[in-house]
Amino acid sequence: METIKIMGENLTTGAKKVLKEFHSFKDAATYGRSIKKYLKETNKGYEETLGFASICYAVGPNGHKYQYYYCF
């Protein structure tokens, strides 16, 4: 297990699944790109390190919410 910093937030590898909620698609996409960029810059294979990563769109009672799922 290892802790990496993405957009000022510490993430621990080895986590089963993490769900992060955003208020805009742009924020969710930027977050995803930041993770990929970090893995590329540190020579960690994206496919090898992340089990999956996808952006999900859901509409709830409070309006639109964008969620980013990633798995180490």
Predicted feature locations:
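Short aromatic-glycine-(Arg/Gly/Cys) micro-motifs in beta-strand/loop hairpins
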Residues: 1-18
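A broadly tuned "polar low-complexity/structure-edge" signature
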Residues: 3, 25-29, 68-72
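Short, intrinsically disordered, low-complexity terminal segments
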Residues: 5, 25-26, 50, 55
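Alpha-helical interaction segments
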Residues: 12, 21, 56-60
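A short, charged, amphipathic alpha-helix used as a generic interaction element across diverse proteins
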Residues: 12-14, 23-48
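Short beta-strand segments
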Residues: 17-20, 66-68
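Short, mixed-charge low-complexity intrinsically disordered segments
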Residues: 37-72
